């Protein structure tokens, strides 16, 4: 049986918390990774132990992940990320809607779609984009400059992954206006999203071409992985919403990042309180 470690982390992780989890998982030792993370060595990882650890950690705001011992970041070849509310702090379409004065209407649809309550993502996107008809195209730049920020740990995760030889893919059900700028800013290898139609400096309320939905996200990831010779167990994928589930299922290391309950329930790994760079603590140097 493969030896597993339990990596625990949170912004306020205490020695006492690490020791309690070590006892719960019958760890053979504790190695401090940083002041916010620890690796509990050679733990029990049967289903009952996993459930007990998950319940304990969730109730105390601690991220916990069972990982094979000796795992190295360089063993992976691809890092794939969603954009809105994963790589960045906002849902871009909601902020564009704010400029148009229809944020409440658009946000309601966005939230329902991300929770998985609206099964047809393409239709939900068309409904939301239609509400943006007549918005000046300059609103996109306004959102990018004033509202959009990288989520904590984004730059460290990406630069460390790139240094370890991973190729980085950004694939989003959002818009190319933002993904292309983030691709250039972070020197990503590839980025895909939907393109808003603009005529005479105004949004028309339409998306050009096919909608990049959950199925398309998974296809882009598989094609990118194939191009870079990555097997499924060499792929890290991160997302937060229901439209990320198929992409996450295509990865050996699927990560629900500050995600909706539906996504956390169906994903092997989760970061609920840590930054994006919390992923790095799962790998040994």
What are these regions (language model features)?
Residues 77-92, 240-243, 248:
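Asp-based phosphoryl-transfer active-site loop
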Residues 51, 139-285:
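C-terminal cap/substrate-recognition subdomain and adjoining C-terminal extension
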Residues 20, 48, 52, 105-108, ...:
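Exposed alpha-helical structural elements
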Residues 11, 46, 85, 175, ...:
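Short beta->alpha junction loops/turns
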Residues 14-18, 136, 213:
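A diffuse structural propensity rather than consistent per-protein peaks
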Residues 26-43, 63-74, 86-196, 215, ...:
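Alpha-helical substrate-recognition element adjacent to the catalytic core
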Residues 77-79, 111, 235:
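Residue-level marker of motif borders
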Residues 1-81:
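Non-catalytic pre-domain segments flanking phosphatase-related domains
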């Amino acid at each position: 049986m493969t030896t597993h470690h339990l990596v625990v982390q949170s912004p306020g992780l205490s020695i006492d918390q690490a020791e309690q989890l070590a006892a719960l998982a019958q760890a053979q030792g504790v190695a401090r990774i940083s002041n916010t993370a620890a690796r509990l060595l050679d733990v029990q990882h049967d289903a009952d132990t996993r459930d007990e650890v998950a319940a304990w950690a969730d109730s105390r705001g601690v991220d916990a992940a069972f990982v094979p011992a000796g795992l190295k970041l360089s063993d992976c070849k691809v890092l794939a990320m969603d954009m809105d509310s994963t790589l960045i702090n906002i849902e871009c379409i909601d902020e564009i809607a704010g400029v148009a004065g229809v944020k409440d209407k658009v946000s309601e649809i966005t939230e329902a779609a991300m929770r998985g309550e609206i099964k047809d993502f393409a239709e939900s996107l068309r409904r939301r984009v239609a509400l943006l008809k007549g918005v000046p195209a300059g609103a996109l730049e306004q959102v990018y400059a004033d509202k959009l920020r990288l989520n904590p740990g984004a730059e460290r995760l990406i630069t460390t992954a790139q240094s370890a030889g991973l190729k980085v893919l950004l694939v989003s059900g959002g818009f190319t206006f933002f993904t292309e700028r983030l691709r250039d800013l972070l020197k990503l290898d590839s980025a895909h999203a939907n393109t808003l139609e603009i005529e005479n400096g105004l949004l028309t309320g339409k998306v050009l071409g096919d909608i990049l939905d959950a199925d398309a996200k998974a296809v882009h990831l598989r094609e990118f992985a194939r191009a870079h010779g990555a097997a499924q167990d060499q792929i890290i994928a991160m997302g937060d919403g229901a439209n990320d589930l198929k992409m996450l299922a295509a990865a050996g290391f699927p990560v629900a990042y500050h995600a909706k309950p539906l996504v956390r329930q169906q994903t092997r790994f989760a970061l609920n309180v840590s930054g994006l760079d919390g992923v790095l603590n799962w790998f040994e140097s």
